[in-house]
């Protein structure tokens, strides 16, 4: 099963995350199928590749809790429901 989750980058005490599509059996920082954006909690910046995220969600991908919250803030689920 494919999951949309965060992959940690950055240095100690300065996290930076990439939103990725990955097989659920792989480890957190394993090889991603596709990178779909980034999230910087320190600066409060988020950039998402919405068309590819919608593609993976339509294909049955599950989101982690944190990525789900990010997608709700970016109103991706609203766009997904409008497309159906």
UniProtKB/Swiss-Prot annotation:
The keyword Membrane does not apply. Keywords: Chloroplast, Plastid, Ribonucleoprotein, Ribosomal protein. Gene3D superfamilies: 3.30.1320.10. SUPFAM superfamilies: Ribosomal protein S16. It comes from the Eukaryota. It is found in: Plastid, Chloroplast. It comes from Mesostigma viride. Belongs to the bacterial ribosomal protein bS16 family. Pfam families: Ribosomal_S16. This is Small ribosomal subunit protein bS16c. PANTHER family: 30S RIBOSOMAL PROTEIN S16, SMALL RIBOSOMAL SUBUNIT PROTEIN BS16M. InterPro entries: Ribosomal_bS16, Ribosomal_bS16_CS, Ribosomal_bS16_dom_sf. GO terms for molecular function: structural constituent of ribosome. One of its GO terms (cellular component) is chloroplast. Its main location: plastid. The lineage of its organism: Eukaryota, Viridiplantae, Streptophyta, Mesostigmatophyceae, Mesostigmatales. PROSITE patterns: RIBOSOMAL_S16. Coiled coil: none annotated. GO terms for biological process: mitochondrial translation.
